[in-house]
Design a protein with these regions (language model features):
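A short, charge-rich alpha-helical start-of-domain segment used by transcription regulators
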Residues: 17-22, 28-55
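Conserved RNAP core-binding helix
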Residues: 21-27, 43-44, 63-84, 186
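Sigma70-family region 2
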Residues: 29-33, 56-63, 74-94, 112-114
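Short, small-hydrophobic-rich alpha-helical interface motif
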Residues: 31, 50, 54, 71-79, ...
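Amphipathic, Lys/Arg- and hydrophobic-enriched alpha-helical face
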Residues: 43-66, 81-85, 169, 214, ...
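Amphipathic alpha-helical segment used for protein-protein interaction
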Residues: 50, 128-181, 188
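Arg/Lys-rich amphipathic alpha helix in sigma70-family domain 2
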Residues: 85, 100-125, 129-137, 158
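DNA-recognition helix of helix-turn-helix
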Residues: 107, 165, 176, 182-185, ...
């Protein structure tokens, strides 16, 4: 039976479309002033991004015990509670801060379930391993598609680009989303992806090609709009 990798169906219901840099800056300023509604909107923008990253850190055994969306909800609650501790002023600094909270949540959850689990689950996972895994997945997400040719005065930062691409990834049908996460973000070979998804290696290759084409089309529609 196929093993689903994507952030479960709750992510598909989240608002799609990523805000402009100016809008994020405005919401950061309002949230810092203590306004709760802008803070909620701000965090919601990064739900899909964080869910994608969380899903890359859970193998099929841990996914039986941990839900990516539950981990992200815990991350959002911590970010909402501790927002006054955020010292950055830019979208990329906010993304980095949220990612660090997610890393702490992931490490705690994985350590708890590894300790409670059987021998077939990794016994020990260091915080450095989680940091490395999340950072690698974030970089891979940002580089899935070629960057737009923006002017030097308006660079697309890696973190912001990754968050925007996660919104488009969330719009894909589940098997497309799964195969892109497994191949592009986790870097698994097709034979291993085939085992994860319960399909032949050839079928997985064709699925991945179709998924990438659809992903490009989805992203291009925003670029052209």
């Amino acid at each position: 039976m196929a093993t689903m990798v994507s952030a479960d169906s709750s992510s598909a219901g989240k608002k799609s479309g990523f805000p402009s840099r100016d809008e994020v800056l405005r919401l950061i300023e309002q949230a810092r002033a203590g306004q709760t509604e802008p803070l909620g909107q701000l965090l919601e923008f990064y739900f899909n991004y964080l869910t994608v990253l969380a899903s890359t850190q859970l193998d099929h055994r841990l996914r039986k015990r941990l839900s990516p969306s539950d981990l992200v909800q815990e991350t959002m609650m911590a970010a909402h509670r501790d927002f006054q501790a955020f010292r950055g002023n830019s979208p990329q600094e906010l993304v980095g801060w949220l990612r660090q909270i997610l890393i702490n949540v992931l490490h705690g959850a994985i350590a708890k379930h590894v300790k409670a689990g059987k021998r077939d689950i990794r016994r020990e996972v260091s915080i450095d391993q989680v940091v490395s895994g999340v950072d690698r997945s974030a970089a891979n997400l940002a580089s899935i598609l070629p960057g737009r040719q923006d002017s030097p005065s308006s660079p697309i930062h890696c973190e912001e680009r990754a968050a925007s691409l996660a919104e488009h990834l969330a719009q894909l049908r589940p098997d497309y989303r799964d195969v892109i996460i497994l191949r592009n973000l986790k870097g698994l070979p097709f034979d291993e992806i085939a085992e994860e998804m319960g399909r032949s290696s050839g079928a997985v290759r064709m699925l991945w090609l179709r998924a990438i084409d659809k992903f490009k089309d989805t992203f291009q529609m925003e670029v052209d709009s």
